[in-house]
Curated annotation (Swiss-Prot):
Keyword terms: ATP-binding, Helicase, Hydrolase, mRNA processing, mRNA splicing, Nucleotide-binding, Nucleus
PROSITE patterns named in the record: DEAD_ATP_HELICASE (PS00039), HELICASE_ATP_BIND_1 (PS51192), HELICASE_CTER (PS51194), Q_MOTIF (PS51195)
SUPFAM superfamilies xref list: P-loop containing nucleoside triphosphate hydrolases (SSF52540)
Polar residues: compositionally biased ranges: 94-104
Name of the protein this chain belongs to: Pre-mRNA-processing ATP-dependent RNA helicase PRP5
Domain Helicase C-terminal residue range list: 505-659
Ranges of residues in domain Helicase ATP-binding: 298-476
Family classification: Belongs to the DEAD box helicase family. DDX46/PRP5 subfamily.
Length: 862
């Protein structure tokens, strides 16, 4: 027992000895630290005395300088000619003082408490470094003396206790060299600059508008071109006006407006065409006599006049401008290397361009001319190759023609030799908003060109616009405006809108197809619907009912669209084609004897073009329209179209009564008529122009809107960085606003005090990838100690959010557009993360721009 007691005493003694040793070591280190602190305070006091010593030395130096300037020196050597500079002295003095002060900063030790660290921080005073020598002005005598005076003044301010860097010109240089951050105002300017840069890059990336070289034909010399190729034959000379009017009335009621319009012809020989063209007309195509629109339009165009031609569908409008175009080109000298086309034909759709090319080839092969069809959705390389070889005629859509004119800086082709321009289906072209593209093409063509406009419908609203392009035009209307050809039999099937409407319409369609197949087993059937989805759905339903068919709409690739038309046009191909109104223009298929409007057209002009796909070139055809009893406006248009085409007896009494009820509603103000092709594209274009103009006025401070009497002064300053500015190009610029408070979409104990939502849905795909990839986000998260989460759902550009859904009696909003949620404990952390994300966006847009420029389009850049 005594032995155990002795052992416990020894253990206690040894432990007390070890504690004493540790305490002594701690006291020794504390004494050393106090000694070092005292020495640093002493050296600091010495440093405080230095400015007084330096000030006295500086006064002595100034006196010596003044004495030297008062007594002229004899220049003996090159060294004596140079003035004494204060720069080396100041540089050496400030560099030594800076090095001394950096040595005084003690290293932190983990054994001291927080109070010791605060005392330690007091001794480490921040000092400024001398500006970079490279940034100082050149060492001329005047500049050097001015710099010395400025530095001396700043040293005096430093001695008096004021900072000589506050208003100095060297502040930015010192901040750059020493890592001193700017004020909050500078940070805001940097953010606005980054936001402006991002906006400009996004607009540049999304702005696909091709710039064409401006041409001033008033300063150019170009050879005159012969336009008049028609001389009236003896049999048509000196005909009294009464007989001319009677002849025009007999020819489908031709109406002419304009001065000096020639008399209509009655046979091809009266045009005086070359034998090669006459052979194609009479032998290859089998056209014995011209149609009414051809009888009047051909002599007018071949007389060199500008024309507005309006005629029924299938009346031969294409041939009315093809023959004068071929005759016009044959009279001109052949193309030389680098010459562009002589004739240009613009169309609103690709299918119409292909149809016109098919008509042109019949003549170009006979007279050894070439034609190039240019439209989007197909490889551009072959089109560029054809233009490089030289082609006399271009047929295409306005967008692709501009692409080719702008390709390779305008070296692919040009329109300097173009003297004949045709706008086919001009009303639809303007209605689709092609006016800017048409103006661009016109700016590249010499002003003395001949221009021809043709269409089956031509609203008065667009007539004034069309006349602005033409010079003293002649307007020719054959068969009336927006009138169905008399060769077409029109029928309307009225469907009750109660019960399963879709099934009722399908059964009615199947019945019509079966009846027609019995009467005409080889006849083609064209079915029109309103929407692309409806076309695909109807194709599936017809296939399920053992009816072979094919579909065409704007959502199909050009290869598929071309294949579908080829399959439908082939004599042994498919009999049924389902299409949207994209096939309502220019589609000319032999044997197409039945057109079915599965969805009633929204206005009469569209109806005229749809049913005009049958009954072409004098042949007969049938048009059947399925309409619901509740579609009063559509029924009124159908009744009006049938009356205008002389089919009053074919109008059912029930249909007429519904139309009369609708007219009463219109008179009472309850309803209004459809405007048809009334220039919606022009109105939308003008609206966009007004929006852009308003934003530009806000940007440049010309007009600032006021709300509730308070001027929104920041609108002009931030216009470039606002979403509205970028939405001009179709992209919403991300917002980087920081909100104080916890984000509602997060939960749990780790929610942060500040957050920011940055929408990235509308950014280009490559830019989004650069921002949200794992490496980029992890680096930003580590650098800023924030949380960044990708949320929401991606929506295609310019698409609207779906409507809220009702589930269990509650309204559930749709998922928001794709965005990044940035969360942080401090506002500065979130602000820094936003800054880094903005930089990543700029990098991503640059990458997207480079890839877009390097897209594989062959040897040429478009």
């Amino acid at each position: 027992m005594s032995q155990l007691h002795t052992n416990s005493k020894e253990v206690h003694a040894s432990s007390s000895n070890s504690q004493d040793d540790k305490l002594q070591k701690r006291r020794a280190r504390l004494a050393a630290w106090n000694q070092k602190k005292a020495s640093s305070e002493k050296s600091e006091n010495n440093e405080d005395k230095k400015p007084k010593i330096e000030s006295s030395k500086l006064q002595e130096w100034i006196k010596r300088r003044q004495q030297k300037s008062a007594t002229p020196e004899v220049p003996s050597t090159e060294a004596s000619q140079k003035p004494t500079s204060i720069k080396p002295i100041l540089r050496a003095r400030l560099s030594t003082s800076s090095s001394k002060q950096t040595q005084l900063v003690p290293k932190k030790r983990s054994i001291f408490d927080d109070d010791d660290e605060q005392d330690d921080a007091k001794t480490a005073k921040k000092d400024f470094r001398i500006p970079n020598e490279k940034k100082l002005p050149a060492s001329t005598e005047e500049q050097e003396s001015e710099d010395e005076e400025k530095v001396l003044e700043r040293i005096r301010q430093a001695e008096s206790g004021t900072s000589f860097l506050v208003e100095s010109g060297f502040e930015q240089d010192l901040g750059a060299d020493s890592g001193i951050s700017g004020s909050e105002g500078d940070e805001e300017d940097d953010e606005e600059g980054q936001q402006r840069l991002l906006s400009e890059k996004l607009q540049k990336l999304t702005n696909k508008e091709k710039k064409l070289m401006a041409l001033d034909y008033t300063q150019m010399e170009y050879t005159s071109v012969r336009k008049k190729f028609y001389t009236p034959p003896e049999e048509l000379k000196d005909v009294p006006p009464e007989k001319v009017t009677a002849l025009r009335t007999a020819m489908d009621g031709i109406k002419v407006r304009g001065s000096d319009c020639p008399m209509p012809i009655q046979k091809w020989a009266q045009l005086g065409l070359p034998s090669s063209i006459m052979t194609v007309l009479e032998e290859k195509l089998g056209y014995d006599t011209p149609s009414p629109i051809q009888s009047q339009a051909l002599p007018a165009i071949m007389s060199g006049r500008d024309i507005i031609g309006v005629a029924n569908t299938g009346s031969g409008k294409t041939l009315a401008f093809v023959i004068p175009l071929i005759r016009h080109i044959m009279d001109q000298p052949p193309l030389k290397s680098g010459d562009g086309p002589i004739g240009v034909i613009l169309t609103p759709t690709r299918e119409l361009a292909l149809q016109i090319q098919k008509e042109l080839v019949n003549f170009t092969q006979a007279v050894e001319l070439s034609v190039c069809c240019c439209y989007g959705g197909s490889p551009i390389e072959s089109q560029i190759a054809d233009l490089k070889r030289g082609t006399e005629i271009i047929v295409g859509t306005p967008g692709r023609v501009i692409d080719l004119l702008a390709a390779n800086g305008g070296r692919v082709t040009n329109l300097r030799r173009t003297t004949f321009l045709v706008l086919d289906e001009a009303d639809r072209m303007f209605d689709m908003g092609f006016e800017p593209q048409v103006n661009k093409v016109l700016s590249q063509i010499r002003p003395d060109k001949q221009m021809v406009l043709f269409s089956a419908t031509f609203p008065k609203k667009l007539e004034s616009l069309a006349r602005s392009f033409l010079v003293d035009p002649i307007e020719i209307v054959a068969g009336g405006i927006s009138v169905v050809a008399p060769e077409i039999t029109q029928r309307v099937v009225l469907i009750d809108d109660s019960g399963d409407i879709s099934q009722k319409k399908l059964q009615a369609l199947l019945k019509i197809v079966d009846e027609f197949s019995v009467e005409d087993p080889e006849g083609k059937i064209l079915i029109f619907v309103d929407k692309q989805e409806a076309a695909d759905d109807l194709m599936v339903r017809l296939l399920n009912n053992q009816i072979s068919c094919i579909v065409i709409h704007g959502g199909k690739d050009q290869v598929d669209r071309k294949h579908a038309i080829k399959q439908f046009s082939d004599k042994n191909g498919l009999r049924v084609l389902i299409a949207t109104s994209i096939a309502a223009r220019g589609l000319d298929v032999r044997g197409l004897n039945l057109v079915i409007n599965y969805d009633a057209p929204s206005h009469m002009e569209d109806y005229v073009h749809r049913v005009g796909r049958t009954g072409r070139a004098g042949a007969t055809g049938t048009a059947v329209t399925l309409v619901l009893s509740s579609q009063e406006r559509e029924i009124r248009d159908l009744v009006r179209a049938m009356k205008m085409s002389g089919k009053v007896d074919d109008i059912p009494a029930e249909l007429q009564s519904i139309a009369d009820k609708f007219l009463k509603k219109v008179k009472s103000g309850e309803e209004k008529f459809n405007s048809g092709f009334g220039g919606k594209g022009l109105e939308n274009l003008q609206e966009r122009r007004d929006n852009v103009r308003e934003i530009e006025m806000q940007m440049y401070g010309d007009k600032v809107k006021e709300t509730n009497g308070v001027s929104n002064s920041s609108a002009g300053r931030k216009a470039l960085g606002t979403p509205e500015a970028a939405e001009i190009a179709g992209i919403k610029l991300p917002d980087f606003d920081i909100v104080e408070g916890r984000a509602p979409e997060t939960s749990g104990p780790d929610r942060c005090k500040f957050h920011s939502r940055i929408e990235i849905n509308d950014l280009p795909q490559k830019a989004r990838w650069v921002v949200v990839n794992r490496d980029s986000l992890s680096k930003i998260i580590d650098a800023t100690s924030t949380s960044i989460t990708s949320k929401g759902q991606y929506y295609p550009p310019n698409s609207k959010l779906p409507k809220p859904t009702i589930k269990y009696g509650r309204e559930i909003p749709p998922p928001p557009k794709l965005y990044l949620l940035v969360e942080g404990l401090t506002k500065s952390a979130v602000q820094e993360a936003n800054k880094l994300l903005r930089q990543k966006m700029i990098e991503g847009v640059d990458v997207a721009t480079e890839e877009d420029a390097k897209a594989p389009i062959g040897r040429y850049n478009v």
